[in-house]
């Protein structure tokens, strides 16, 4: 059985990896953290896309037929372009998934007040990805997003558990 690739711009995606390992114990995983270029939140679409595509290709080269983008900014800025423009032409038998849609699917079920606060990078907040996805599944919720430029450094320094 092939390994599932998990990509993040740093260490934050290890929480996604831990959850995947618990839910899918029959699979092996390869984690790729791009700590040298983290954080991605303030970077342009082109930079995030290039870095994410590079990591995805490396995980494909390591034999992963599925790559999970555990990075919110990569999911917000690069996922759709990779899915719609790169995969059909170059890797039609491989898949790349992000974390925003699955999070948006369950967020409405978790709130009793229907008011949700989201702390994220500037790039994730500016993309409106969470608002666009969450309204599809839970149109009754009100999402409050706040860009926190210091969030990723706190996670990377292990001062906050994400």
Residue spans of the language-model regions?
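Non-catalytic structural scaffold of enzyme domains
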Residues: 1-162
